[in-house]
Amino acid sequence: KGERRFLLTDEKHPVYLTAGDVRQLQLSISAILSGIEVLLKKAGLASSELNRIYLAGAFGCYIDIESSIKTGLFPKLPTEKILQAGNLAGTGAAMVLLSSHALLKMEKEAGNIVHVELAEDEEFKELFLFNMNFVN
């Protein structure tokens, strides 16, 4: 391509970092952090009020929590408040299939869910632009 790149490993097994890679990282971090900030505001909470953040699925299993906080992906919280929880969708499905009590509880909680369309939220758009900077 002719794109400038930085070699991260040895020449035998080359892994390169490009400006495009950095840009994608900026966009990804900004989208996740901005989404978290909007949802917290709509819930009337500050990140400092969170007792726990559960990270689920493959994303939650393999992400380095400390690096994620340092890069700004997550709010600045003590690492012990962020828990890698594994396959919660599978666990939840098994719970409601095996327990009528769990099914009733899930149905009740489902009524409390509020859908937030972040792509159309003006505050999200503003935060997304602001959070693209690594200096936040």
Tell where the protein language model's regions lie, with residue ranges.
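Helical "lid/coupling" subdomains associated with nucleotide-phosphate turnover
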Residues: 1-136
